[in-house]
Amino acid sequence: MAVFLLATSTIMFPTKIEAADCNGACSPFEVPPCRSSDCRCVPIGLFVGFCIHPTGLSSVAKMVDEHPNLCQSDDECMKKGSGNFCARYPNNYIDYGWCFDSDSEALKGFLAMPRATTK
């Protein structure tokens, strides 16, 4: 009887599932990004970005192509003329990196940053 009442109560009173709020500024080093694992942080600078919902990933791919420093490979950095090394963000929610010259001090500082950890 109790199981029947529990089952019928979920049918009669469905719970509303809230969509993640994927707005505002974020850091590509923040895990999870934008305070939700349902969102992604798209860098617009080395340490700052904006939150999006993954349904907008086609626009993100276009933005990565057009941004001079966002990359997915060393070759892409060389094609864009932004460096010769694509340093990946230490965040498994971000599928791209930032272009650097392989002998630059900025790259050494970027690589010295602590790796983000998932909880």
UniProtKB/Swiss-Prot annotation:
Keywords: Disulfide bond, Knottin, Seed storage protein, Signal, Storage protein, Toxin. SUPFAM superfamilies: omega toxin-like. It holds the Pfam family Albumin_I. GO terms for molecular function: nutrient reservoir activity; toxin activity. The C-terminal glycine may be removed from A1b. Residues 57-64, 118-119 form a propeptide. The keyword Disulfide bond applies. InterPro entries: Albumin_I, Albumin_I_a. Residues 1-19 form the signal peptide. The keyword Signal applies. Disulfide bonds join C22-C39, C26-C41, C34-C51. A1b binds to basic 7S globulin (BG) and stimulates its phosphorylation activity. The presence of a 'disulfide through disulfide knot' structurally defines this protein as a knottin. This is Albumin-1. It comes from Glycine soja (Wild soybean).
